[in-house]
Regions:
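A composition-biased, non-transmembrane "mature-region" signal
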Residues: 1-211
Length: 211
């Protein structure tokens, strides 16, 4: 008997403008067994390593195992039919995670692209990439700060999308290493900047810029 096994990418979530998160799973007959690594896809045959997204992991399991378990449960009796329908519904529900849907989440995704060169959320970025991006963003902010801090942009606003994107990026990366209370303040300021931005233009070429 030949056992077909290996690794596969599945669990696509948070897609926008051709970018999305997936998880690389060990599989048997294409059925995911356990997650191996997270990936952020930035274009055709391009991407970068990312931390594992729990949404992607759940989606990867639910979209493959869910229908199979649901179908099997339906043959066990009336209670199994109910359980089977529940499995199928739960599997289908993860499709809502496939794309970035709300306007606020879309603006955050766009600002991620402008600031970091990837739409990946900062908490999924690997440490080495954060360590490379943060001094670059802080240096860029130093050139355009005009005596303000990134939090000042959140409080007082700006008509300059470049300043908004860089301030947003500095705040989000800073939040990763701050104590919880300060991190929450930085994230709140970044969210305020995103809420105030309506029209975004490309801010140069990031290392993972999508075509």
């Amino acid at each position: 008997m030949i056992i077909f096994y290996g690794t596969r990418r599945t669990g696509k979530v948070s897609a926008r403008e051709g970018q999305y998160a997936v998880t690389r799973f060990a599989h048997v007959y294409y059925l995911p067994l356990f997650p191996i690594a997270g990936l952020w896809i930035t274009g055709a045959d391009r991407g970068h390593v990312a931390k594992v997204s729990w949404k992607s992991v759940i989606a990867g399991y639910a979209r493959t195992w869910g229908p199979l378990l649901g179908l099997g449960a339906m043959f066990t009796g009336p209670a199994g039919v109910v359980a089977g329908i529940g499995c199928v519904v739960a599997s289908a529900a993860t499709l809502a995670w496939s794309h970035v849907r709300t306007p606020s989440a879309q603006r955050r995704s766009d600002l991620n692209q402008l600031a970091f060169g990837t739409r990946c959320e900062p908490d999924l970025l690997p440490r080495e990439l954060v360590d490379a991006l943060r001094p670059e963003l802080e240096a860029r902010w130093g050139e355009i700060a005009n005596g303000q801090s990134p939090s000042d942009v959140a409080r007082f606003g700006t008509d300059d999308v470049q300043r908004a994107a860089v301030a947003y990026g500095v705040l989000r990366l800073s939040a990763l290493s701050l104590p919880r209370a300060q991190a929450s303040e930085a994230e709140a300021d970044a969210a305020r900047i995103a809420d105030n931005v309506r029209e975004l233009r490309q801010l140069g070429d990031g290392p993972y810029r999508s075509p």
